[in-house]
């Protein structure tokens, strides 16, 4: 049965087809080369947004730092990071007033978690900047290296202790006059290969002890390594993301725990929930605004976009928020939570690998490491790069750039959401003291704003007031990229709302298909994807049945496991036919062994082996599920979780 794709759209309303215009099929773009240029862009942009702030020099590291907080009030619509501390604190106070006890309760929850969390929490996560080797490593390795070096420097760290004790070590390490580390270096030498008699380069990795003085150690502890964000669709330019080292991670974790606890209690927060729960939250806010506006009011919704959210955020604002939120709490707790923002106020951005140069005439390639950018002759660079380097030079120390303002991507998602929600919270009539009022949703830098007013002038006034209020705390709503519609049609975090949520099906398109690496995983992923889309994305029964047939077809072609009684010849068909003929109960064979497909849209939740178990020949059962079978690995069962299975 072959499918004509145009038939799928005959009865689809236009708004449901919007999702197919998303750039989601095909491979996403990946970045190549170094991220140095993108990182310099980020550093330069961040300083430009805060350029009217005050410059100071960090006494410990000698890094020049720009502080835009309580800077000039904006006179134009350009994005800026001049948050006013008193406005932030007032927004926090109003948030607490309208949610009684919220900060108090979240602090108590967090305090409990702080005392129980083990240090191995930090092994979760991907690539982490390993300050001992000055490059990225998997999180577990970076943590182990850090603990090992702390130990050899007389600190008490251990891998199974509490996270809070590890953080005490981090604090102590920053007071030390010097830290001795073991670092790796590469030796290259040219040797003649005995076999081929050609010259080859041999690399050996050696270990050496190195002493870091206080300044060098502090710079490393405060460094965020940067990389280019991969696989971003729908963008022409790549951008830089940051990964912090182990010294910062633990402190950030506790701050985010507190902020998460607060977000869970805020109806306007799109974090930390996701999926259908997030849609339900959203629908509630929309319902509330629509119900109130039915008789006399107009209701409009802005699908919002903020300009460079994290480059205009400021760690000092977060410090003020935390100081306020924890104001009645024990001293030790306040200290632990305030360290993360303080470290971010003094952070350094590592510029990455540097630039690659090649000479066409001499066929030579050479890399200029970031450390050399401070004093290399700029005549080798093209004009745009030259401008970047000139701008960033005053900020450079040892190949890292001092970056006090701004937050870098994805660091304080929860806490910045709390800040956003605190402005949405000010839209209640008792605060606006006029005819317009607003509400909305915030999820990290994404927001949807619903404004109600008796007439269009009121709506405009409400939007203007929201815009200006945001400016006061360093949030810059982009007038160019936000658009306004009658409430009932908007987009928030890639959920499209039109009198209810429209399934954004194209987001799922890449997961339909067979990867061709692992037969059993592909089978279970394939049917699960179809099941999930029936639950979440309006995939109807007829289309799902068709998707299932196409999937089985695709699967059989990928693994060449056509039914044993088929006429199709492949290089597996001889073996599969033999198995087919030897098997008494042919229905019991797995699809990957040339068996028939027993899946339909009613039994997608059952793994294939379970589905066919009763139908299998005994010796076939023994082969599939035999602990002594050398081709099937079996772990000792450590614990049993009873799955909650919905009928």
From Swiss-Prot:
EC number, UniProt record: 2.7.7.48
Organism of derivation: Influenza A virus (strain A/Chicken/Hong Kong/YU562/2001 H5N1 genotype B)
Identification of the protein by name: RNA-directed RNA polymerase catalytic subunit
Segments carrying motif Nuclear localization signal: 187-195, 203-216
Region (Disordered): 50-82
Residue spans crossing the bilayer: none
Annotated GO CC locations: host cell cytoplasm; host cell nucleus
Organism superkingdom: Viruses
Skewed-composition ranges (Polar residues): 55-64
Known catalytic reactions: RNA(n) + a ribonucleoside 5'-triphosphate = RNA(n+1) + diphosphate
The RdRp catalytic domain, residue ranges: 286-483
Subunit structure, as described in the record: Influenza RNA polymerase is composed of three subunits: PB1, PB2 and PA. Interacts (via N-terminus) with PA (via C-terminus). Interacts (via C-terminus) with PB2 (via N-terminus); this interaction is essential for transcription initiation.
Family, per entry: Belongs to the influenza viruses polymerase PB1 family.
MF terms (GO), sorted A to Z: nucleotide binding; RNA binding; RNA-directed RNA polymerase activity
Biological processes, Gene Ontology terms: symbiont-mediated suppression of host gene expression; symbiont-mediated suppression of host mRNA transcription via inhibition of RNA polymerase II activity; viral RNA genome replication; viral transcription
Record's comment on post-translational modification: Phosphorylated by host PRKCA.
InterPro entries with a match to the protein in the record: RNA-dir_pol_NSvirus, RNA_pol_PB1_influenza
Role this protein plays: RNA-dependent RNA polymerase which is responsible for replication and transcription of virus RNA segments. The transcription of viral mRNAs occurs by a unique mechanism called cap-snatching. 5' methylated caps of cellular mRNAs are cleaved after 10-13 nucleotides by PA. In turn, these short capped RNAs are used as primers by PB1 for transcription of viral mRNAs. During virus replication, PB1 initiates RNA synthesis and copy vRNA into complementary RNA (cRNA) which in turn serves as a template for the production of more vRNAs.
Location in or out of the cell: Host nucleus; Host cytoplasm
Keyword line: Eukaryotic host gene expression shutoff by virus, Eukaryotic host transcription shutoff by virus, Host cytoplasm, Host gene expression shutoff by virus, Host nucleus, Host-virus interaction, Inhibition of host RNA polymerase II by virus, Nucleotide-binding, Nucleotidyltransferase, Phosphoprotein, RNA-directed RNA polymerase, Transferase, Viral RNA replication, Viral transcription
Region (Promoter-binding site): 249-256
Pfam families per the UniProt record, alphabetical: Flu_PB1 (PF00602)
């Amino acid at each position: 049965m072959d499918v004509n794709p145009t038939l799928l759209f005959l009865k689809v309303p236009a708004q449901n087809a919007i999702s197919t215009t998303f750039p989601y099929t095909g491979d996403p773009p990946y970045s190549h080369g170094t991220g140095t240029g993108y990182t310099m862009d980020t550093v330069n942009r961040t300083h430009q947004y805060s350029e009217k702030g005050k410059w100071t020099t960090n006494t410990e590291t000698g890094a020049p730092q720009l502080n835009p907080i309580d800077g000039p009030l904006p006179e134009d619509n350009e994005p800026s990071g001049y948050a006013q501390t008193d406005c932030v604190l007032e927004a926090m106070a109003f948030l607490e007033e309208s949610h009684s006890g919220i900060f108090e309760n979240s602090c108590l929850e967090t305090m409990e978690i702080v005392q129980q969390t083990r240090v191995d929490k930090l092994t979760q996560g991907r690539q982490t900047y390993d300050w001992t080797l000055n490059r990225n490593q998997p999180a577990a390795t970076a943590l182990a290296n850090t603990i090992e070096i702390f130990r050899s420097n007389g600190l008490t760290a251990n891998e199974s202790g509490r996270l809070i004790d590890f953080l005490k070590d981090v604090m102590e390490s920053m007071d030390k006059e010097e830290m001795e580390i073991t670092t790796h270096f590469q030796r290259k030498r040219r040797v003649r290969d005995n076999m081929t008699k050609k010259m080859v380069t041999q690399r050996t990795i050696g270990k050496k002890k190195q002493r870091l003085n206080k300044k060098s150690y502090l710079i490393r502890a405060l460094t965020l390594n940067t990389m280019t964000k991969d696989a971003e669709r729908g963008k022409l330019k790549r951008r830089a993301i940051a990964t912090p080292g182990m010294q910062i991670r633990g402190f950030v974790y506790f701050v985010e725990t507190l902020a998460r606890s607060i977000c869970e209690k805020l109806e306007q927060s799109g974090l930390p929930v996701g999926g259908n729960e997030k849609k339900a939250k959203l629908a509630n806010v929309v319902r509330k605004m629509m119900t109130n506006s039915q008789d006399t009011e107009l209701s409009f919704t802005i699908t919002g976009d903020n300009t460079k959210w994290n480059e205009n955020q400021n760690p000092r604002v977060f410090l003020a928020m935390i100081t306020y939120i924890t104001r009645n709490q024990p001293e030790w707790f306040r200290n632990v939570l305030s360290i993360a923002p303080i470290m971010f106020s003094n952070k350094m951005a590592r510029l990455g690998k540097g630039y690659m140069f090649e000479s066409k005439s001499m066929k030579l390639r050479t890399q200029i490491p970031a450390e050399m950018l401070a004093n290399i002759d700029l005549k080798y660079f093209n004009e745009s790069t030259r401008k970047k380097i000139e701008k960033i030079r005053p900020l450079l120390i040892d190949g890292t750039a001092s970056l006090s303002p701004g937050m870098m991507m994805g660091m304080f998602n929860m806490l910045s959401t709390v800040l956003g929600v605190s402005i949405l919270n000010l839209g209640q009539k008792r605060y606006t003291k006029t005819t317009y009022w607003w509400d909305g949703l915030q999820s990290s830098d994404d927001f949807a704003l619903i404004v109600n007013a008796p007439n269009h002038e009121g709506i405009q006034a409400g939007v203007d007031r929201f815009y200006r209020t945001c400016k006061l705390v360093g949030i810059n709503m982009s007038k160019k990229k936000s658009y306004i519609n009658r409430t009932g049609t908007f987009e928030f975090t890639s959920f499209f709302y039109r009198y209810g949520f429209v399934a954004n099906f194209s987001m799922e398109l890449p997961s339909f298909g067979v990867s061709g690496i692992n037969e059993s995983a592909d089978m279970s992923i394939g049917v699960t994807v179809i099941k999930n889309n029936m639950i979440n994305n309006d995939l109807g029964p007829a289309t799902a049945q068709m998707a299932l047939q196409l999937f089985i077809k695709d699967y059989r072609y990928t693994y060449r496991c056509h039914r044993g009684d088929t006429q199709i010849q492949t290089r597996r068909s001889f073996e599969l036919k033999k198995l087919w003929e030897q098997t008494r109960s042919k229905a019991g064979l797995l699809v990957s062994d040339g068996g028939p497909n027993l899946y339909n849209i009613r039994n997608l939740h059952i793994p294939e082996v379970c589905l066919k178990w009763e139908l299998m020949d005994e010796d076939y059962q023994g082969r599939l599920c035999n602990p002594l079978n050398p081709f099937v690995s079996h772990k000792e069962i450590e614990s049993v979780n009873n799955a909650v299975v919905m009928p």
